[in-house]
Amino acid sequence: MCRHQPRARLSPDEQLAAEESFALYCKPVELYNIIQRRSIKNPAFLQRCLLYKIHARRKKRSLITISLSGGTNKELRAQNIFPLYVLLARPTNNVSLEGHSPIYRFSRACLLTSFHEFGNKDYTEATFVIPDVKNLATSRACSLNIILISCGRAEQTFDDNNCSGNHVEGSTLQKLEGKCFWGKIPIDLLASSLGNCVSLSLGHTVEMSSTVEMTPSFLEPKFLEDDSCLTFCSQKVDATGSFQLQVSISAQEAGAKDMSESPYSVYSYNDVPPSSLTHIIRLRSGNVLFNYKYYNNTMQKTEVTEDFSCPFCLVPCGSFKGLGCHLNASHDLFHYEFWISEECQAVNVSLKTDSWRTELLAEGVDPRHQTFSYRSRFKKRKRVEISSDKIRHVHPHIVDSGSPEDAQAGSEDDYVQRENGSSVAHASVDPANSLHGSNLSAPTVLQFGKTRKLSVERADPRNRQLLQKRQFFHSHRAQPMALEQVFSDRDSEDEVDDDIADFEDRRMLDDFVDVTKDEKLIMHMWNSFVRKQRVLADGHIPWACEAFSQFHGQELVQNPALLWCWRFFMVKLWNHSLLDARAMNACNTILEGYLNGSSDPKKN
């Protein structure tokens, strides 16, 4: 059932915009319909196993309390009735032998020792939980019976160790073999009396009484030890001496306490005629209003569902709380606001455009041409953990790339094997004097540790034959490569001409029209630096910024505009969590050293 909110006076353009705004609900709803159709054949989980579904079923059960009143049983003496055992049992079959009752299997037994006006409450009431009386006729519980057993021996004692409250273990009933009086109250008869009771649906307690015919019989507990079963034989005792017992029965819904806490459940039905009360309660039970907001939340359309059902997939959720769990877990493309009052239970639904904007396709666009993200589960590898004490004093080391032999020798000397088998660089600081001078001087490379490479001799001969059949081209020059170049240890990707790279970088930056000259210069300096120093990962950014501040510090302090561009760039890196406060402070300390004219800025 859907209801439109009366529209205000809108112009034709505004009405068209409002309709387009409401049409945005169609895409997510269509997606949920597709998911729902697929889940029918291959469900991801069973609805009945959800925790809020289980709680909802438990709240719909009925709580039955059995007690005896001394006022209605004045003709009977207490010593002839008590102790009275009350059992909730089900017949194992409908076939019974002559003179025998059906064999009953019980799940719970309670003990009453006095009338409910006297004595301890634990031993004056027997409480059982049965399914909802509305669904009792179609469930297995329709064959349940409340069985009352009186041995008529007041002097009989019972073991407290076998009693928990008024709950009695089966070992105690094994001692009751012999003459007794017994009677039963069929649950289906009780359900027929409670089914038309309106007060029970409102969470109130219903009081009623029942007359039970207690007939003499002989209790045979031969099945108690194994199956918790018992039967009664009427041939072994005199059939005379039966009596009637007035039993007080109170019933209420198991979730009545939780219902009384809800404002929606305390609605007053005083003005409702008794003839329409049942119909009104049925209509109000489980009804939820969904208000769909659109057109900047200025307009809405209302839909009503029954039995706490979801409006998108029509799944009954059992309770208002369960409905909230279902909507937030299964339909998170919308934003929900839940509110409840004495008049209604409602949910305000609005679009959460940011969460599904990238998932929906534009009009007329082929889905096969859309970019999608894929995450592969790589095999987890054991990482070698290096303690912070071992890497605390590591600093970036910049060397001249003009002598690759020296760089390789320095790399072998600066890396040593620690006790845990991991390679850690020694603390080495390049003199500040080597960083002064021209900013675009001879190319420099960052010192790295030894890298293990796969030699040609260790390669698979079959792979070598396959490589010989293909033609390879240089990564930068796009010229055919000889086999010797293909199988060499050098990678053509690493053969970068710094002069050409700087020229291409400057030409690319010159095409920018919305940046200043100083911004172009700082971008070119940074691009050139990270290329020559091989800054390859996000974790390299902190030491790269320190090295950049030290390498270009003299030029930065001579140009205040360029210095501010560099500091603004560091703030950008900090906003993206690529640069921490410690590294930024170290960079500013280095720059302040150059401003103060210090010969070694890193000491300041």
UniProtKB/Swiss-Prot annotation:
Q: Which CDD domains does the UniProt entry name for this protein? A: VEFS-box_EMF2-like, ZnB-Zn_EMF2-like
Write out the GO cellular component annotations: chromatin silencing complex; nucleus; PcG protein complex
Q: Where is this region: VEFS-box?
A: 454-589
Which keywords label this protein? Chromatin regulator, Developmental protein, Differentiation, Flowering, Metal-binding, Transcription, Transcription regulation, Zinc, Zinc-finger
Biological processes annotated in GO: cell differentiation; flower development; heterochromatin formation; regulation of long-day photoperiodism, flowering
Tell me the tissue specificity.
Widely expressed.
Gene Ontology MF annotations: chromatin DNA binding; zinc ion binding
Question: Which Pfam families does the protein's record reference?
Answer: DUF7651 (PF24663), VEFS-Box (PF09733), Zn_SUZ12 (PF23320)
Give the residue ranges for region: Disordered. 396-440
Zinc finger motifs (C2H2-type), residue ranges:
310-331
Phenotypic effect of disruption: Dwarf phenotype with early flowering under long day (LD) conditions. Defect in floret development.
Q: Which family does it belong to?
A: Belongs to the VEFS (VRN2-EMF2-FIS2-SU(Z)12) family.
Describe its assembly: Component of the polycomb repressive complex 2 (PRC2), composed of the core PRC2 components FIE2, EZ1 and CLF. PRC2 methylates 'Lys-27' residues of histone H3 (H3K27me3), leading to transcriptional repression of the affected target gene.
Chain's role: Polycomb group (PcG) protein. PcG proteins act by forming multiprotein complexes, which are required to maintain the transcriptionally repressive state of homeotic genes throughout development. PcG proteins are not required to initiate repression, but to maintain it during later stages of development. They act via the methylation of histones, rendering chromatin heritably changed in its expressibility. Polycomb group (PcG) protein involved in the repression of flowering under long day (LD) conditions. Regulates floret development.
Official protein name in the record? Polycomb group protein EMF2B
Q: Which organism is it from?
A: Oryza sativa subsp. japonica
